[in-house]
């Protein structure tokens, strides 16, 4: 159960991190 929960949370947080990183790169490159 813990691993499943961690997987769900990890997926969401990773997606958020990727979005944030993409936005940062976009801003940096202008």
UniProtKB/Swiss-Prot annotation:
Record keywords: ATP-binding, Chaperone, Cytoplasm, Isomerase, Nucleotide-binding
Catalytic activity, as annotated: ATP + H2O + a folded polypeptide = ADP + phosphate + an unfolded polypeptide
Domain of life: Bacteria
GO terms for cellular component: cytoplasm
Top-tier EC class: isomerase
InterPro entries in alphabetical order: GROEL-like_equatorial_sf
Main location (coarse class): cytoplasm
Location in or out of the cell: Cytoplasm
EC number in record: 5.6.1.7
GO molecular function: ATP binding; isomerase activity
Assembly description: Forms a cylinder of 14 subunits composed of two heptameric rings stacked back-to-back. Interacts with the co-chaperonin GroES.
Annotated family: Belongs to the chaperonin (HSP60) family.
Physiological role: Together with its co-chaperonin GroES, plays an essential role in assisting protein folding. The GroEL-GroES system forms a nano-cage that allows encapsulation of the non-native substrate proteins and provides a physical environment optimized to promote and accelerate protein folding.
Name of the protein in its database record: Chaperonin GroEL
The organism's taxonomic lineage, starting at the top: Bacteria, Bacillati, Bacillota, Clostridia, Eubacteriales
GN (gene name): groEL
């Amino acid at each position: 159960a813990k691993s499943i929960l961690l997987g769900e949370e990890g997926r969401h947080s990773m997606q958020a991190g990727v979005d944030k990183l993409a936005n940062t790169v976009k801003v940096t490159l202008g």
